[in-house]
Structure formats: structure tokens, C-alpha cells
Amino acid sequence: MFDSQFDVIVVGGGHAGAEAAAASANLGAKTLLVTMNLQTIGQMSCNPAMGGIAKGQIVREIDAMGGYSGIVSDLTAIQFKMLNKSKGPAMWSPRVQSDRAQFALKWREVLERTPNLDFYQDMVVGLIVEKNQIKGVPTGLGNKI
């Protein structure tokens, strides 16, 4: 089914998988993002927030490396809040709550404009390993990528 080789296959299209696929493709690797549902690429969990002490630090680091999570969060924000204001400035941490549907839509728009990136809707069910190297993945629909 697949007549091209991929340098990187990202399994899972949540916001972390979307970020990984974008980073890989932007570095020039021919990348495939495999997701169970193309309509939910980039979808947030039930708590539609980015930020906080731990996750906020990661978002800032991703942003500094050219990632999109912070940008997509800003574009789809419905509330901004600085957490831990009752503590010292070292503990302050920004958090944004986003519109879940808009967040997924914006991520999809970003990914569709990314060169070197293809999408495939299916479920990865294992790994194809040859000589201790991962060479591909089998899918639930019986394809080998």
C-alpha cells in the first residue's frame, strides 16, 4: 500500500504526537503520522489546559526549539491565568485554557502545511524488527509501513 519509505513514523496523533511529527518533518525527515482518527489530531485531554509548573516549563522549552504547542494554545485560548501568584515569582507559572475543538482544528491546519509530513488513519499493532533495528510497523488493517 505504501510506495514510499519514511524516515520517521510517529504513532499517535494527540498533541504530543502532533508536536513530534512536526519537529521530525521540520528537520527534513520524511515523516508519517499514524493516528486512529484523523478528525482528532492534536486533541487535548478532558482538561484543556497547557501550562502549570511542570507542563508549562516543557511548553516553553518546546517553543524555544521552534515547536507549535504554545502557538496553538495562544491561538485557541479562552482563558489565561498566572498560577501561584501568592508565592514568590520563581513559582509563578502561566496556564492557558483552550477551546478543545479549535485546538485540534488549529493543530490539523499547522500539520497540513508542514512539508515532509504525511498522515495515515489506522492502528499500529506492533513493530517490524530486523537485526535489532526497527524497520516499520504492522497495522490493524493488515498493512506494513
Task: Name each region found by the language model.
Residues Q5, A22-Q133, T139-N143:
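Conserved N-terminal/central alpha/beta ligand/cofactor-binding core
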Residues F2-A16:
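Beta1/beta-strand and adjacent pyrophosphate-binding region of the FAD-binding site
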